[in-house]
């Protein structure tokens, strides 16, 4: 939001389509899309404090959902694409996940198979999850989003990130909004000139389920 105010016309995201075409988004455009997505999530019934998991590769959709969820006080729970069925089941149960967004139908089916009796909404990008969110935004206003955003405290949990689980079940680490603000400010103190330069281009290939990739996205 800060950058959207200071540099609304600066390109902050470049995404490449399956046919190789590149689409650029400015800070102002990204903010508007995040707000609209947040409206849709509220329309779908996502409440403050709800845990919402994302099982998908690094993508614009991941960024969009994450920022929208954080802006309305929900908690993002990343799931690695490489996680096993038992690890996914553990994460869903341990974090009390209420909704999951996946990249593919196959991933959605895997989630449903490990928690068949679990009250859980599952949507995949390849089956129109983003369009579903957009439709749900119809009766929600930006003022509703602003009200939810104003109620978010720096001490509120922003995300629960799970370890790889190499020595047992994955262990969840809760990070607050203040945690991310502190690390982002630290990064900007060292790399501020690079981060704010319109000439800077960064290729993010890390899985966004990793905390370092999240930090890179935020700064």
Question: Where is each model-derived feature located?
Answer:
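Conserved AMP-binding A3 loop
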Residues: 24-28, 158-184
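Conserved AMP-binding/adenylate-forming core of the ANL superfamily
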Residues: 9-67, 84-89, 175-178
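Conserved ATP-dependent adenylate/AMP-binding module captured primarily in the ANL superfamily
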Residues: 50, 81-113, 183-203
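Conserved pre-ATP/AMP-binding loop-to-beta segment of ANL
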Residues: 9-11, 140-162, 169, 195-201
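Conserved structural elements of the adenylate-forming
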Residues: 31-36, 154, 173-194, 202-205
């Amino acid at each position: 939001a800060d950058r959207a105010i200071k540099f609304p016309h600066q390109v902050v995201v470049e995404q490449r389509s399956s046919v190789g075409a590149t689409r650029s988004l400015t800070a102002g455009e990204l903010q508007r899309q995040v707000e609209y997505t947040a409206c849709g999530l509220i329309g779908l019934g996502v409440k403050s404090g709800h845990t919402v998991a994302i099982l998908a590769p690094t993508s614009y959709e991941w960024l969009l959902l994450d920022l929208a969820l954080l802006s309305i006080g929900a908690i993002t729970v990343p799931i690695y694409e490489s996680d096993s069925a038992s690890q996914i089941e553990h994460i869903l149960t341990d974090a009390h996940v209420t909704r999951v967004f996946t990249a593919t139908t196959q991933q959605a089916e895997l989630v449903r198979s490990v928690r068949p009796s679990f009250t859980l909404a599952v949507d995949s990008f390849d089956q129109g999850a983003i369009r579903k969110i957009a439709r749900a935004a119809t009766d929600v206003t930006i003022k509703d989003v602003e009200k939810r955003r104003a109620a978010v405290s720096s001490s509120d949990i922003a995300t629960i990130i799970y370890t790889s689980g190499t020595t047992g079940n994955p262990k969840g680490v809760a990070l607050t909004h203040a945690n991310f603000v502190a690390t982002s400010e630290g990064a900007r103190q060292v790399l501020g000139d690079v981060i704010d330069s319109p000439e800077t281009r960064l290729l993010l290939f890390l899985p966004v389920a990793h905390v370092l990739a999240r930090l890179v996205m935020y700064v």
